[in-house]
């Protein structure tokens, strides 16, 4: 088992090495302004037998939880996803795709995860484009981390002598993101949690049979840095091995960068059953000038709302909304089915945006047409649904021959990264809430009022009965006047005339 705790400051921040005290496998330091990332790497044979059996059904499994609270991301922790619970999965065999084992385990670990099995509830990803895409995708707008935190306390903290283990597990409730990744090649599970840029107390404790590495780092820009690289400098120490921190400086290629811009999202009023989501971007200026760049928005829409790919195929319509084109949408998307009969989680789509020309420093807007599904009846006649913010980024092509090997902070299997080539660099635009403090928008959807459902069903039945009675009365009136077959049909008259000739 290996543990890595990293405090990351902005460029220009610094900490005096003498303020870090190491004693008996414990590191203490001052309170600093920094982001924090904790990563725990566990070999599969160190896990409980039931989890080993579950992971044996997966070739790869990536769970990504993103908080709906806005947070400031700093270099190199820049990769973003829409807020919510994301899962990317490749089964070990075809039979595992139809097994309910994964969904049952997700419900035990995270509570109410609405899935039956991957084949029914997940959507498929286009693996024919780039090899690093998983086979299936699942998404849910919200999930409760309390069951997972309780599981961590039970499995990791119950046998640990570290008094801070339970407290660290409780801090997961305030994490900006939580990632759990497994692949059959490494035979290891990586749990990674990040907290946003804020005041953090520098403190770390080593655990028995665990190699604990602690870093206090900040972004740096040495003169030899390549355009596609990020520089990092700071202090590193291995608890229980080093007596004092060691200075370090290194650089690595990264596909995720900061566009140093922001956007917001809100629905135009009135929303109706065909709401339009308006994105307002702070700047239309590309993040770099010496490469081809295009802005994109990646959506994960729950099954209560969807986009119509036919509508998004009209070039003139797209141009009127400042959209260039629909680059991807998951399939199938039933345009008529109500929400309560849909088995799949929803749909994901990638839209290329069309920034205005010759206005590089001004804000601009994009309109995305969406459609609501019919929802289940509810008391009061309305149901509130949450629509998460998309992930907005500029996709820029790196120079020919540029390679992006794995780096210590890299994130892959994000859903949209598999839709681009391996030399694409993502310059992320920071989301900012328009109203409130959540990166989602609420829509009040009209539904059948359960308090009036009896009147509606009774009235419908009465209307059908009256309509049937009226039709029968009219038929009876016609028959009573003319009788049945009293008048010969036109065909019979023709036959009779021919016989008489």
Curated annotation (Swiss-Prot):
Cellular component terms per the entry's GO annotation: endoplasmic reticulum membrane; glycosylphosphatidylinositol-mannosyltransferase I complex
- What does the record say about its membrane topology? Single-pass type III membrane protein
Question: What domain of life is recorded for the organism?
Answer: Eukaryota
- Tell me the pathway: Glycolipid biosynthesis; glycosylphosphatidylinositol-anchor biosynthesis
Residues exposed to the Cytoplasmic side: 480-501
Q: Which UniProt keywords apply?
A: Endoplasmic reticulum, Glycoprotein, GPI-anchor biosynthesis, Membrane, Transmembrane, Transmembrane helix
**Ranges facing Lumenal side:** 1-458
Stored Pfam families: PIG-X
Q: Where are the transmembrane segments?
A: 459-479
Q: Where in the cell is it found?
A: Endoplasmic reticulum membrane
- At which residues is glycosylation annotated? 174, 322
The biological process GO terms on file are: GPI anchor biosynthetic process
InterPro entries from the UniProt entry: Pbn1, PIG-X/PBN1
> Which SMART domains does the annotation name?
PIG-X
Which residue pairs form cystines in this protein?
none
For this chain, the family text in UniProt reads: Belongs to the PIGX family.
Q: What does this protein do?
A: Required for proper folding and/or the stability of a subset of proteins in the endoplasmic reticulum. Component of glycosylphosphatidylinositol-mannosyltransferase 1 which transfers the first of the 4 mannoses in the GPI-anchor precursors during GPI-anchor biosynthesis. Probably acts by stabilizing the mannosyltransferase gim-1/gpi14.
Listed name of the protein: Protein pbn1
Q: Which organism is it from?
A: Neurospora crassa (strain ATCC 24698 / 74-OR23-1A / CBS 708.71 / DSM 1257 / FGSC 987)
Q: What are the leading ranks of the lineage?
A: Eukaryota, Fungi, Dikarya, Ascomycota, Pezizomycotina
Q: Which gene encodes it?
A: pbn1
């Amino acid at each position: 088992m290996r543990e890595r705790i990293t405090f990351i400051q902005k460029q220009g921040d610094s900490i005096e090495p003498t303020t870090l005290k190491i004693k008996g496998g414990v590191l203490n330091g001052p309170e600093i302004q920094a982001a924090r990332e904790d990563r725990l790497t566990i070999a599969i044979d160190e896990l409980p037998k039931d989890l080993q059996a579950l992971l044996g059904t997966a070739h790869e499994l990536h769970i990504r939880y993103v908080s709906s609270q806005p947070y400031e991301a700093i270099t190199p922790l820049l990769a973003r996803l829409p807020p919510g619970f994301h899962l990317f999965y490749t089964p070990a065999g075809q039979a595992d795709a139809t097994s309910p084992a994964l969904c049952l385990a997700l419900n035990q670990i995270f509570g109410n995860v609405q899935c039956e099995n991957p084949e029914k509830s997940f959507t498929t990803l286009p693996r024919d484009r780039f090899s690093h895409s998983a086979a299936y995708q699942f998404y849910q707008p919200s999930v409760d981390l309390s069951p997972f935190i309780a599981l961590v306390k039970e499995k990791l903290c119950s046998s640990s002598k570290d008094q801070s283990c339970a407290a660290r597990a409780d801090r997961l409730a305030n994490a900006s993101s939580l990632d759990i990744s497994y692949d059959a090649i490494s035979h290891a599970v990586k749990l990674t949690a990040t907290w946003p840029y804020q005041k953090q107390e520098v403190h770390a404790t080593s655990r028995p049979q665990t190699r604990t590495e602690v870093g206090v780092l900040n972004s740096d820009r040495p003169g030899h840095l390549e355009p596609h690289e990020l520089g990092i400098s700071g202090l590193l120490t291995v608890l229980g091995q080093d007596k004092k921190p060691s200075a370090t400086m290194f650089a690595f290629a990264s596909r995720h960068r900061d566009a140093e811009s922001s956007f917001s999202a809100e629905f135009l009023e009135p929303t109706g059953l065909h709401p339009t989501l308006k994105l307002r971007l702070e700047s239309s200026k590309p993040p770099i000038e010496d490469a081809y760049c295009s802005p994109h928005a990646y959506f994960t829409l729950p099954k209560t709302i969807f986009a119509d790919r036919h509508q998004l195929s009209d070039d003139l319509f797209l141009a009127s909304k400042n959209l260039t084109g629909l680059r991807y949408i998951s399939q199938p998307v039933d345009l008529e089915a109500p929400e309560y009969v849909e088995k799949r989680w929803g749909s994901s789509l990638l839209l290329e945006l069309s920034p205005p020309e010759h206005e590089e420093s001004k804000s601009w807007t994009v309109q995305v047409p969406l459609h609501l599904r019919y929802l289940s009846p509810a008391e009061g006649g309305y149901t509130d649904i949450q629509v998460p913010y998309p992930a907005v980024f500029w996709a820029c092509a790196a120079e020919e021959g540029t390679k992006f090997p794995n780096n210590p902070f890299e994130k892959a299997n994000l859903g949209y990264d598999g839709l681009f080539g391996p030399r694409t660099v993502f310059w992320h635009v920071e989301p900012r809430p328009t109203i409130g403090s959540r990166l989602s928008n609420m829509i009040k959807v009209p539904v059948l009022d359960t308090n009036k459902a009896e009147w509606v069903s009774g009235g419908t039945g009465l209307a059908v009965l009256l309509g049937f009675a009226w039709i029968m009365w009219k038929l009876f009136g016609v028959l009573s006047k003319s009788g049945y077959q009293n008048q010969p049909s036109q065909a019979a008259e023709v036959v009779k005339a021919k016989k008489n000739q």
